[in-house]
């Protein structure tokens, strides 16, 4: 693994680039966005670096980006068809009664407020959302959970846990708490088939050694 001045790069070849997106950095290609920062990190201002999936701006962790149009098309297909694996770690306030479970909800989107909400019944714009989780550790008013997404709705993890009374630490959009930390949600593992060779590739990364993550390290 190589650590650059701007962005930590975990793997790179002619087709793909796997890196760790810092919190507060946009996933999209615009000034200050992840592809732009990667070009600076690599010292290649004209490099073809394409976003094929996204993390919320406030979320950090592993992402894979494409290095050419063909790779972007193939990786995007995997994301659409569910062949792309994404696993997250989060720190919740409290501990769910079930240490391992699947959460299923109907989620809608309030575009004016830029917020996601749990809907009571099917309606226009409402989509099914599903995730599985496992409690890895508990400490006082916090629990470390591992999350596997089955759908990729906006703010899905944050809303599904907050609606059950277990908001993430650092959550300011779906909780009234004022935690002294960043949002405790991290893309800890990704897996995909290499767009050229077809080889399955899997990457893991530890969350930052800052509060509240350091309570479990």
List each model region and its residues.
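A late-sequence structural motif
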Residues: 152, 198-201
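Non-heme Fe(II)/2-oxoglutarate
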Residues: 191-197, 208-209
């Amino acid at each position: 693994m190589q650590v650059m001045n701007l962005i930590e790069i975990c793997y790179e070849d002619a087709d793909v680039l796997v890196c760790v997106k810092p919190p507060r950095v946009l996933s999209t290609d615009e000034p200050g966005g992840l592809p732009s920062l990667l070009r600076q990190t690599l010292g290649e201002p004209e490099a073809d670096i394409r976003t094929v999936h996204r993390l919320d701006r406030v979320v950090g962790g592993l992402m894979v980006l494409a290095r050419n149009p063909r790779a972007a098309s193939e990786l995007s297909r995997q994301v659409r068809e569910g062949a792309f694996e994404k696993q997250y770690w989060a720190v919740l306030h409290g501990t769910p009664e079930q240490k391992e479970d699947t959460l299923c909800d109907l989620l809608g989107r309030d575009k004016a407020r830029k917020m996601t909400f749990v809907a009571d019944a099917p309606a226009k714009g409402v989509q099914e959302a599903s995730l599985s989780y496992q409690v890895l550790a508990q400490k006082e008013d916090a629990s470390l959970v591992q999350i596997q997404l089955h759908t990729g709705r906006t703010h899905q993890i944050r809303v599904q846990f907050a609606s059950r009374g277990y908001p993430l630490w650092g959550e300011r959009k779906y909780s009234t708490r004022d935690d002294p930390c960043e949002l405790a949600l991290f893309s800890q593992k990704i897996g995909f088939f290499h767009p050229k060779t077809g080889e399955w590739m899997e990457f893991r990364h530890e969350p930052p050694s800052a509060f509240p993550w350091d309570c479990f390290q």
